[in-house]
Amino acid sequence: MPQLNPIPWVFLFFLVWLVLGFLGLQKFTSVVTTTLDDSSEEVEVKSKEYSWPW
């Protein structure tokens, strides 16, 4: 049985994880930006609604 060269497999392994991580990060950042936009609007409303607790 011939021994396979591990270098291309390691490269492909990291390439696949890099692509998956990039796509996950892109999805995560899009979710975070939408939640940050929503929360920033809520914070503005809350700051007008409530005074400082102390």
Swiss-Prot record:
Q: Does the keyword Transit peptide apply?
A: no
**Keywords annotated in UniProt:** ATP synthesis, CF(0), Hydrogen ion transport, Ion transport, Membrane, Mitochondrion, Transmembrane, Transmembrane helix, Transport
**Record's subunit section:** Component of the ATP synthase complex composed at least of ATP5F1A/subunit alpha, ATP5F1B/subunit beta, ATP5MC1/subunit c (homooctomer), MT-ATP6/subunit a, MT-ATP8/subunit 8, ATP5ME/subunit e, ATP5MF/subunit f, ATP5MG/subunit g, ATP5MK/subunit k, ATP5MJ/subunit j, ATP5F1C/subunit gamma, ATP5F1D/subunit delta, ATP5F1E/subunit epsilon, ATP5PF/subunit F6, ATP5PB/subunit b, ATP5PD/subunit d, ATP5PO/subunit OSCP.
Q: Which organism is it from?
A: Branchiostoma lanceolatum (Common lancelet)
Q: What is this protein called?
A: ATP synthase F(0) complex subunit 8
Bilayer-crossing regions:
9-25
Gene Ontology biological process terms from the UniProt entry? proton motive force-driven ATP synthesis
Family, similarity comment: Belongs to the ATPase protein 8 family.
In which broad location class does this protein mainly occur, judging by the first location in its UniProt entry? Answer: mitochondrion
